[in-house]
From Swiss-Prot:
Record-linked InterPro entries: bL21-like, bL21-like_sf, Ribosomal_bL21, Ribosomal_bL21_CS
SUBUNIT field: Part of the 50S ribosomal subunit.
GO biological-process terms attached to the record: translation
UniProt-listed HAMAP family: Ribosomal_bL21
UniProt keywords, alphabetically: Chloroplast, Plastid, Ribonucleoprotein, Ribosomal protein, RNA-binding, rRNA-binding
Lineage: Eukaryota, Rhodophyta, Florideophyceae, Rhodymeniophycidae, Gracilariales
Domain of life: Eukaryota
Family recorded in the similarity comment: Belongs to the bacterial ribosomal protein bL21 family.
Protein name, UniProt field: Large ribosomal subunit protein bL21c
Function: This protein binds to 23S rRNA.
Single GO molecular function: rRNA binding
Chief place where the protein resides: plastid
Amino acid sequence: MLYAIIEADGKQMWIEPGKYYDVNYIPGEPGDYIQFNKVLVLRQENDIYVGKPCIQSIIIKAKILKHLKSKKITVFKIKPKKNSRKKQGHRQKLTRLLIEEFYNQI
């Protein structure tokens, strides 16, 4: 089993090649390729490599599939005894990435 734990946009993600993941918006056109070089843990077959803090020689190649928005959340603020109400909605922009391959930079 091949998997890696990477840091992307300040968050840690468990990823596997051939699967897609939704992350916070990354500028770029659908079809563009991006690379992640902050690999914290890598597992190949029976070997586990742990970075201190990152594994410098491993790069992960991902393809931008599309941009989308998350589900809408509603924020409703009320101030007691003041008849003050404020309703607000928010949809986070996301980018769907397809993890294509892990490769060694050396």
